[in-house]
Each structure stands twice: as C-alpha cells, then as structure tokens.
Amino acid sequence: MRRTRGLAAAALLVSLHCALAEEGPAALSWETLAQVSVTHQRGRYAPKFSTQLIALDKKAVTLKGFMVPFDQGLAQTRFLLSAEPAECPDCLSATAEQFAEVVAKTPLKYVIDAITVCGTLELVRDDSGALLYRLTEAVMVDK
C-alpha cells in the first residue's frame, strides 16, 4: 500500500513537471529529431544537433511513437520509442535519429499501438555508441 502511494505520488510529480513546463511541453516530432548530423573529431564520431534541438535540451517535451521494450513483461520502465512500429524488425529504420531511449518514472504498460510520452529531453553527446536522444522522468500522456 505504501509503495503504491509512493509510485502514485512520483507519477503525479512527473505529470506536473510536464504540465507546468513553461508554456507547456514542446511537441517534438521525428522530423525535428532528424535534424542532426555526425562529425568526425579527434578520432571520434560526434553528433551535431540543430539549434532547434539544442534549444529543447533539458526541456519537457512530448513525443509520439511505438514502444520497443528492452525486457520481457508488460511493465516497462526503460524502452525505446520508435518512429515506426516494431511489428517487423526488418521494417525498422536503421538510423539512430528514429529512436529515443525512454526512462519512465514509473512502469508503463506495454502496448503495440502508438503512444505519446512526456519527459525531459536529453541530447546524448558522448561517443558511447548510445542513441542520440533520451527522455527521462517520462510519463505516458496518450495511448
């Protein structure tokens, strides 16, 4: 019971973060996420983000896409959000800007249909081979 109350309170705080963001969360599109190029500097590859993306870094945004879970199970706290449905692995785009890592504040129920999540956008600038985008403290705002 106490854990359920704690999870509900955490979800409410994240929802407030998205709802109370100055002027509301920005609606982010996959076209905007495609505004990135890769440069080669000092033997490493580094993303070069557009000024529009840089302005959204560390801001509350919403993004619509399809869940691609890392783990089995119905409850997901960390997953990929894809521009395209994951029903057919051969149909997915191979480009990094077509995916965003989502770290949910509370577990989200896995669904096949498109969802909209709200979270804090992080531009991933390191050369770790990770994705280019991460949404943290994310909550589902629409299925």
Residue positions per predicted region:
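Positively charged n-region of N-terminal signal peptides that target proteins for export
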Residues: 1-5
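Bacterial N-terminal signal peptides
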Residues: 6-17
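OB-fold and OB-like single-stranded nucleic-acid-recognition modules
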Residues: 21-143
